[in-house]
C-alpha cells in the first residue's frame, strides 16, 4: 500500500482542482449569499461587492471538525491567523486573539448580527504579535451551533464602523429559526492520548407571533491538558547526588508538563429573536453568555529551588516541590435589543442598545508568601480584570430612485454613543503585601526572605472609563450597469483624546458579466484600549547591592502605565490613537455561475502603532530614576506609540461546484494569502534609543513572527447522505529573533497540515461523524537549544501542530 504524505495529498487535491474550469469552491448558496458587512445595499453578494468579502456558512464551519470558531476560521481562511500552540499559565490560556492579514488582534473589529462586540478584559503579553499587548475579542465564546454564517470583510472599514477596523471586520450572523433543532456530542483527543475533549451542543427554533422567531443555542464541555515536553531530570532534593534514588524517582512531579490549560468546564449560550409589532415595525434582540474555568500550570519548583528562592517556610509547606497552578475564571455576557422600522417613504431605521461585559478572576494554587511565614495561605486570589461596553446606535438607510442612475441611490447615516469601562481589582493581601518576616534572615538558609508578588496589587488597581460620540454618512451608487461607487465619512469624539475623522472611497467596474475590477482607499484609526491605557503590574525581589556588601534592598520590576510619572521620566507619554491608510485593488472572475476566482492586493500603513515595550534593564532605568521616589525600580516596560509599520500583501480565493449527477456533488475551495510587514519608523523615547524600547525580539515578532504566506485547499463530496471533506493547509516560513544575538535567530520552515472529516446522515436525522485535524501528525520545527525539563519543544508562536494529530468522533440528531 502506498504511503501518502501531506505534500502528496496537497498535490492530488490541486490536480483535482485543475480538472475543472476554476479554483475550487463552495456551494451556489455561498456564491449568492447577500452580505451584510461592508455595504448598506440589500442586493449585493460577496462576489458583487466593491471590497473582498468571505462568507463561511455554519455548515462549512462544522465540516472543519474544529471545536470553536477561531479554529474553524483558521482552517477555512488564508487571511485569518490564530496560533494554537500551548500557552501554559500565560493569559493566552484563557483568551487568545485572532488576526487578519498578519496584523494585531485588536486591529480587527468583530460584530455580532452587525453590532459591535465587546473585547476581553485580559491583555496577552506573551510573544504572539497578534496577541502581545492586545485586548481582543474572544471568538471561542460563541457556539458554532448558533452561527448561520460568518462574513469577513478584508478591507479597512473605520469610516464605516469606527475604531479597530484597520485590518477588516468579522461579522458573526446568528441563526434565525422558528422551528427545528439539533443536538450533538463530540469526543476526541490527541494521538498521544492527552488533551481529551468532550462537547455537547445544540440549537432549537421556536415560532413567535407575527412571523417571529426565537433561536436558542448552546455548547458545553471540557478539555484535558495536552503537552509535548520531556521528563524533568533535575535533582529535586537538597543534597541529592543521583536521580536514581527512590526518593528522586518517586517524586510525583517527575513527569510534570508545561502545556495547554486544562479547561475544567466551559459552557456558552446564545439567544436570537425577532417579532413583528405592527406594519413595518419589528423588535429584535439577541444575547450571549459564556462561562469558562481554565487551570494553567506554571513551571515546577523542585525542593532545591523552593529552599534557595523562597526559604525554609516554603520547603516545609511543599517538601516534594510545588507545581503552581493559576485558575482563570471567565464570565462573559452581552445583551442587545432594538427596533427596526421599514417605511416606503422614510426608509429603514434601526435603533439598538447593547451591553457587553467580560471579567476574569485569577487564583493561584500551591502558592506561598514566605514573608507571611506559616500564616501564608496556599490558595491566593490574585484579582479581577473587568471590561464592559455599552453602545447606543441609530442607523438610517434609504434608496432614492432617479433617472440618471442605473439603480436607486443608497444613502445611509447614523449616530453612535459608546461608554467603555475597565477595572482592575486587587487580589488578596497575601498575594502582594510583605509580611512580618520580609527581608529578615532565614535561620536555615541564611538568605533574606522575599515577599510574594502575583496578580493585581493595590497600586495596580484602577477604574477607567471613557465616552465616544460619533456620526457617519455613507453613499453607494450603481452609476451605470458596469460602474458602482461608494463614499463614506465618519467623525468621532473621544472623551480622553479628542476628535478623529476618517473616510473611504470604493469603486468597482464590471468589464463583462464575468470579469470585474475593484479598488478602495480609506483612512482608519484605532483608539488605545482602556486595558492598554490602564495596565500596571510589578514584581519585587530582594537583592544585595552592591554584591558582597551585605546591603539587601528591595528592587521592583514594573510594567508602568503609559501616562504615569514613572513612565514620563523614561520618556513615556499618554497613548494616542493609531492612524492608518489602506489601499487595495482587485480582480473578480466568475466564468460560470458556480465558479469564481478573486485576486486582491493591498497596502496598509499604520502610524503610532501601539506596542508594549521590552523590559528595559537596570542599566537604562536606574540612572534615570536615581534620586527620585522610583529609585528602587530596577527594570520597566510600558505601552508606547513609537513605531510605524507598512504591510503589503495579496490574497487569492477560488470556488467551484461540480455536479456529479447521480454521484452527488463536489465543492472545491482554494485560497492563498501572502503578506509582509516592515517597521518604517522607530522613534527614540527621551534619551533612550527606540531600538532599546522595542528590541530585536519584539521587532521580529512584528516583521517575521507570523508565516509569510498561507495556503488553504479543500474538497467536499456530498453523496446520498455521505459528506467527506479533505482539507490541506500550508504555513510559510516564520522567524524568532533572539533579543541580543542575531546568530541565535531561528527560522522555522514551511509546514503542511491535513484534515479529514467523514460523516453519514441517516434518513431519520441521525448523523455520525469521524475525523482528524492534522491527520498525518505534522509538527512545526523544534526550538533550537530549548529542550529542557518540562519546556515545550515548539515555539508558542507556532501556527499549528505543536500537539500533533487530533482525532474525534461525533453524533448529532436533527429534529
Positions of the model-derived regions?
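Short acidic/polar hinge/loop motifs at secondary-structure boundaries
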Residues: 115-154, 202
